[in-house]
């Protein structure tokens, strides 16, 4: 009996998640009401309140679930100084993004939640910044610029990739970003110090 209940709960939460993603394409989270959401997914308000106190509670759970999936991908393939190591990490991250394409697209879209983007930036910084500083100790005074360049380029790519209806595969996206970052690292290594 418990498995049946779990399946229904998962189905309801998936419906709410997908409904929120659809509404976030039209308006910000702060403008979305519980009534709009439950009408969108055709469930009762009482069912919504059984799982969440409000829209923010739903959003919080979604963002935490996505963050945990990204953290898991990083734990399974930690970023190290070896060049070839980053590719597997990127493959896993792009698979997480692809598996959650609709909600991630809404979160990073024009009506999205900046807190989610900042949370992703913190996760990536916590797991990659130190490695870059170890790889380029002589470039520590330029590291902020290089890191911002790579991070914002990757985030821009992700937004474009998510918005593209005929999007390339997660594997291609990971390979593309991997090659761009490695190429940028080589160029960074060759930059001269400011005079």
Q: Language-model segments: which ranges?
A:
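Hydrophobic alpha-helical connector segments
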Residues: 75-103
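Basic, amphipathic alpha-helical hairpins
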Residues: 22-29, 73, 77, 100, ...
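C-terminal peripheral helix-coil segments that are non-catalytic and often amphipathic
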Residues: 152, 160-195
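Basic, helix-initiating cap at the start of DNA-binding domains
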Residues: 1-27
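Helix-turn-helix
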Residues: 23-57
């Amino acid at each position: 009996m418990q498995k049946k209940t779990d399946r229904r709960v998962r189905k309801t939460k998936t419906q709410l998640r997908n409904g929120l993603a659809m509404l976030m394409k039209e308006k910000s989270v702060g403008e979305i009401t519980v009534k709009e959401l439950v009408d969108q997914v055709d469930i009762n308000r009482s069912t919504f309140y059984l799982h969440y106190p409000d829209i923010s509670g739903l959003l919080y759970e979604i963002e935490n679930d996505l963050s945990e999936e990204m953290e898991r991908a990083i734990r399974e393939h930690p970023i190290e100084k070896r060049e070839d190591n980053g590719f597997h990490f990127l493959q896993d991250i792009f698979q997480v993004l692809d598996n959650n394409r609709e909600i991630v697209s809404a979160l990073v879209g024009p009506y999205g939640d900046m807190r989610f983007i900042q949370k992703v930036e913190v996760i990536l910084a916590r797991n990659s910044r130190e490695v870059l500083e170890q790889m380029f100790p002589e470039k520590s005074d330029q590291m902020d610029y290089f890191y911002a360049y790579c991070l914002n380029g990757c985030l821009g790519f992700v937004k474009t990739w998510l918005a593209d209806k005929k999007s390339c595969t997660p594997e291609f996206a990971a390979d593309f970003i991997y090659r761009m970052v490695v190429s940028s690292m080589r160029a960074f290594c060759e930059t001269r110090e400011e005079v």
